[in-house]
Amino acid sequence: MKRSKWRTRFAGAYCDPILRSWLTEPDSLTARCQRASSAFRVRLLRYGKGQALADEAVEGKAGRHSAWVREVVLECDGVPVIFAHTTLSTARRGRMTRWMAGLGSRSLGSLLFAYPGFKRGGIEFLRLDRCHPLYRRAAALGAGRKSLWARRSLHRLGGQQVLVTEVFLPAITLLK
């Protein structure tokens, strides 16, 4: 089995300190974005049935499998700062399936951190390059860098798991 490139420790020694603070934020990025801007918005890019990415494992399944896929961009004062990609296995139905379907342009983070039944796993980090599909999707939002930092974590509720990956766009460093 191929070893994951995602790491449980942040190894960005030469990372901008503001970016580092966002990457290692233990609480809700939605709440922090709301505090750091006067106008916060979640823009829904895509939601529907699709395939999990090769490096995503949800419900204990390695590699590509059928999943509900949701992609949004978090905007602060009209500027894209975070691209978020979420997968939920289609193998089981439950509260998460219904909630994800009904979110629309509302933040998933506000649900994950407000509902007491959620259990969050550890945060993993990866510097995405141009070969990674999430880099390409984030770059389409105007991120013209050779690489972008991302983090991901698994959230559990009952028998379901949702994998949330957040890709940090260059404008994030303009926020505190």
UniProtKB/Swiss-Prot annotation:
Substrate binds at residues 70, 108, 166. It is found in: Cytoplasm. It comes from the Bacteria. It is an enzyme of class 4 (lyase). The keyword Transmembrane does not apply. Keywords: Cytoplasm, Lyase, Pyruvate, Ubiquinone biosynthesis. One of its GO terms (cellular component) is cytosol. Belongs to the UbiC family. Removes the pyruvyl group from chorismate, with concomitant aromatization of the ring, to provide 4-hydroxybenzoate (4HB) for the ubiquinone pathway. This is Probable chorismate pyruvate-lyase. It comes from Dechloromonas aromatica (strain RCB).
